[in-house]
Swiss-Prot record:
Keywords for this protein: Ribonucleoprotein, Ribosomal protein, RNA-binding, rRNA-binding
Family: Belongs to the universal ribosomal protein uL3 family.
Organism: Christiangramia forsetii (strain DSM 17595 / CGMCC 1.15422 / KT0803) (Gramella forsetii)
Gene3D superfamilies linked to this entry: 3.30.160.810, Translation factors
Protein's name in the database: Large ribosomal subunit protein uL3
Keyword Ribosomal protein among UniProt keywords: yes
One GO term of the biological process aspect: translation
Molecular functions (GO terms): rRNA binding; structural constituent of ribosome
Gene designation: rplC
Matches recorded under PROSITE patterns: RIBOSOMAL_L3
Hydrolase as UniProt keyword: no
InterPro entries for this protein: Ribosomal_uL3, Ribosomal_uL3_bac/org-type, Ribosomal_uL3_CS, Transl_B-barrel_sf
Subunit and partners: Part of the 50S ribosomal subunit. Forms a cluster with proteins L14 and L19.
Function: One of the primary rRNA binding proteins, it binds directly near the 3'-end of the 23S rRNA, where it nucleates assembly of the 50S subunit.
Length: 203
């Protein structure tokens, strides 16, 4: 799957030709630099390694790797397979790789919510009613196991814990608009992650 690295700018809404208000996400997609070209002869598979967003402080290894491509070290580096075009080391891949109306998959890191209970984390309904003598069980998880057999809690039991901060991928999001001169993609709907977080757009 070919694609680009982008940065989530934020959400807005636009009107379509029928006057319907559509919520959408604006993403700065590229320009990305080809930092390495993987070949079957050398690496055993074909892929393009793209870099996005210049890095300020960088180690010698990353600096040397970027210098081969004639660029500076990048904050985000991702490999993409399935590019039909013949890109060379140091070439720039822009938002024009995408077209209006096509569907893309977007992966990112979801917003971290911290330690959350089972009602927020898993959608539990809580235990019992708010009356009839019950006073502190409204958002409790309830029973997590049986009795002396199996005498343990099964793996995968839905319980309270850290929520969010995970890799999330949303598929088949429509590209509403491509603003080539500003390297912007307008995507229908929401995209995982907070503002200014990196996302991977693939098709």
């Amino acid at each position: 799957m070919s694609g680009l690295i982008g940065k989530k700018i934020g959400m807005t809404s636009i009107f379509d030709e029928n006057g319907k208000n559509i919520p959408c996400t604006v993403i700065q997609a590229g320009p990305c630099v080809v930092t390495q070209v993987r070949t079957k002869e050398v690496d055993g598979y074909e892929a393009l390694q793209l870099g996005f967003d210049d890095k300020k402080t960088v180690g010698k290894a990353a600096e040397g790797h970027a210098k081969k491509a004639g660029t500076v070290a990048k904050r985000k580096v991702v490999e993409f397979q399935g590019y039909n075009e013949d890109y060379k080391l140091g070439d720039s891949v822009t938002v024009e790789h995408f077209k209006e109306g096509e569907f893309v998959d977007i992966a990112g890191t979801s917003k971290g919510k911290g330690f959350q209970g089972v009602v927020k984390r898993h959608g539990f309904g809580g235990v019992g009613q708010a009356t009839h003598g019950q006073h502190n069980r409204l958002r409790a998880p309830g029973s997590i196991g049986a009795a002396s057999y199996p005498a343990r809690v099964f793996k995968g039991m839905k319980m309270a814990g850290r929520m969010g901060g995970e890799r999330v991928k949303i598929e088949n999001l429509r590209v509403l608009k491509v603003v080539a001169d500003k390297n912007l993609l307008v995507i229908k709907g929401c995209v995982p992650g907070s503002k200014n977080s990196y996302v991977i757009i693939s098709k």
